[in-house]
């Protein structure tokens, strides 16, 4: 977590960001700043634009309008080197996207060698360091099929870290995991936060957001409805839309009653 001064240059700066798919306006004027070393959790209902925002930050989706800056560089500038931008941003998805025919170590060394042009020895050294970082040194020679979902996600995090990113983006990293496997992944993310990694996390893990995030952003309908400290946004939200979302998320029985049309 961060102690970054509010006067310093934001590590991530999103300015009047819009994204449309045909007639569907998914993002409708997003303004967001994330300081160096800051952890920001983005929450909201399905279809609110959370994942699209994340994908626009590293240009997996091209914004319709607006600007995105990472480390002071405008990544949405028409002349930007997109590959260079993506080398500065690590991203972890819901699905692990590991190569099944490669060992864990090879999954970490391949992108280093192809993208960063590291030699085999250096790539292997960095791979080993980052597997240790996520607590999976003993799985270096294993293949993805022999790992649990949680272990595969930790390998995916190690793979992203091996590229030396300035910021890490997480898109629902635990949503595809069985409940008993979530804890180890969140523990790794907590460790990264305490190490000072700048992190933007789309999540429904409210305990993680409460304990680790510097700020929580609630999105709905393609806009930021509420942005503040976890104790405020989660514990005492000021907007009815936020309160309604959290009541359904934290009390599934209430959500079922509403869906059934009960009073």
Identify the role of each PLM range.
Residues 232-263:
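C-terminal boundary and immediately downstream tail of ABC-type ATPase nucleotide-binding domains
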């Amino acid at each position: 977590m961060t102690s970054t001064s509010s006067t310093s240059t934001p590590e991530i700066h999103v300015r009047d960001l819009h994204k449309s798919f045909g007639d569907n306006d998914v993002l409708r004027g997003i303004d967001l700043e994330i300081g160096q070393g800051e952890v920001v959790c983005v929450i909201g209902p399905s279809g609110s634009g959370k994942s699209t925002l994340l994908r626009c930050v590293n240009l997996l989706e091209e914004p319709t309008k607006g600007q995105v800056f990472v480390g002071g560089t405008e990544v949405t500038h028409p002349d930007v080197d997109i590959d260079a931008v993506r080398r500065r941003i690590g991203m972890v998805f819901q699905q692990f996207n590991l190569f099944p025919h490669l060992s864990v170590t090879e999954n970490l060394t391949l992108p280093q060698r192809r993208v960063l042009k590291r030699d085999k020895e250096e790539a292997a050294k960095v791979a080993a360091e980052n597997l240790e970082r996520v607590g999976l040194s003993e799985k270096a020679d294993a293949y993805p099929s022999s790992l649990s979902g949680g272990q595969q996600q930790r390998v995916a995090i190690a793979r992203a870290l091996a590229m030396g990113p300035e910021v890490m983006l997480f898109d629902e990293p635990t949503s595809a995991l069985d409940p008993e496997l979530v804890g180890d992944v969140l523990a790794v993310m907590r460790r990264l936060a305490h190490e000072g990694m700048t992190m933007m996390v789309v999540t429904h893990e409210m305990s993680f957001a409460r304990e680790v995030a510097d700020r929580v952003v609630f999105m709905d309908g393609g806009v930021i409805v509420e942005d503040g400290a976890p104790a405020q946004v989660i514990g005492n939200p000021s907007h009815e839309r936020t309160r309604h979302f959290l009541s359904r998320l934290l009390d599934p029985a209430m959500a079922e009653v509403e869906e059934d049309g009960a009073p």
